């Protein structure tokens, strides 16, 4: 089963894992590979169920805590979501990131979902400095979620950072402006952005919709008032990080979660 998963033959791997499912709770690598295979195949309901079967409070299981936390988060069970998200801050074999990164991002959104704006930003402040650009992105989205007066400025400051290619976030600024009924300003942004990033396909598509007055099409892709949409973008970023490191298996894992949270984008 594990060999097939490594070769990305996910359907074959799923069948083989299912035959030897008795290994669960005895073989941690089996649990990890089977859970990832379920995600690769978009079998999220089965992934949630399997996570509940193998979860153990005494043992850190990164993927299981991540999926269970997301399950409870989407069900608006924020107490149980918090329990699992906080465990993601611990360094373990299954947590490839520094302590206090993924868990704090998810906790920030968990607090935002219960309208606790102050606590939401406190969790962002706990994220390690190496991820300061991700902090800026999440901060912009949370400000947008709470309709903060500084949302526009936050997006503008993000785009002014020339040390990193934030061209994608012109779309989110335009999206925000359209929700604020500032169509003229949105058109000015896309005109400038297309001049700067002529090969960006997302911006090219956005320009097409704007020129053809299909503003609702742009708004249908993303809504910062829907926390699942913003979390989907976070997991999209993680997928890109792993892709840049040529770890395509983990990249696909996070990309699948991103698409599960927001199938429209």
Each language-model region and where it sits:
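Alpha-helical segment of the N-proximal tetratricopeptide repeat
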Residues: 1-16, 230-257, 261
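Residue-level signature for tetratricopeptide repeat
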Residues: 3, 37, 71, 110-111, ...
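N-terminal, post-signal-peptide region of Sec/Tat-exported proteins
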Residues: 5-46
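Structural motif corresponding to the intra-repeat A-B loop/turn of tetratricopeptide repeats
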Residues: 7, 41, 75, 114-115, ...
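Alpha-helical repeat scaffolds
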Residues: 14-18, 44-57, 79-92, 116-129, ...
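Generic helix N-cap/helix-start motif at coil->alpha-helix transitions
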Residues: 24-31, 58-67, 94-106, 128-139, ...
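Mid-chain, structured segments of secreted extracytoplasmic proteins
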Residues: 29-75
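Short, structured interface segments
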Residues: 203-217
């Amino acid at each position: 089963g594990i060999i097939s998963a490594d070769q990305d033959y996910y359907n074959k791997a799923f069948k083989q894992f299912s035959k030897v499912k008795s290994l669960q709770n005895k073989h941690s690598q089996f649990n990890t590979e089977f859970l990832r295979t379920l995600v690769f195949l978009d079998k999220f309901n089965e992934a949630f169920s399997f996570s509940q079967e193998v979860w153990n409070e005494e043992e850190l299981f990164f993927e299981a805590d991540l999926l269970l936390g997301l399950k409870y988060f989407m069900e608006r069970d924020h107490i149980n979501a918090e329990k699992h998200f906080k465990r993601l801050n611990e360094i373990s074999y299954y947590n490839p990131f520094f302590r206090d990164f993924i868990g704090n991002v998810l906790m920030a959104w968990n607090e935002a979902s219960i309208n606790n704006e102050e606590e939401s930003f406190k969790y962002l402040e706990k994220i390690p400095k190496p991820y300061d650009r991700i902090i800026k992105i999440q901060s912009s989205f949370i400000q947008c979620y709470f309709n903060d007066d500084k949302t526009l400025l936050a997006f503008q400051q993000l785009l002014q950072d020339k040390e990193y290619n934030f061209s994608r976030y012109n779309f989110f600024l335009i999206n925000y402006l359209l929700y604020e009924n500032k169509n003229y300003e949105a058109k000015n942004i896309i005109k400038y952005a297309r001049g700067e990033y002529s090969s960006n396909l997302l911006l090219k598509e956005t320009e097409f919709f704007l020129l053809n007055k299909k503003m609702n099409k742009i708004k249908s892709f993303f809504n910062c008032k829907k926390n699942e949409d913003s979390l989907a973008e976070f997991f999209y970023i993680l997928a890109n990080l792993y892709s840049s490191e040529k770890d395509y298996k983990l990249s696909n894992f996070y990309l699948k979660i991103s698409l599960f949270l927001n199938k429209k984008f």
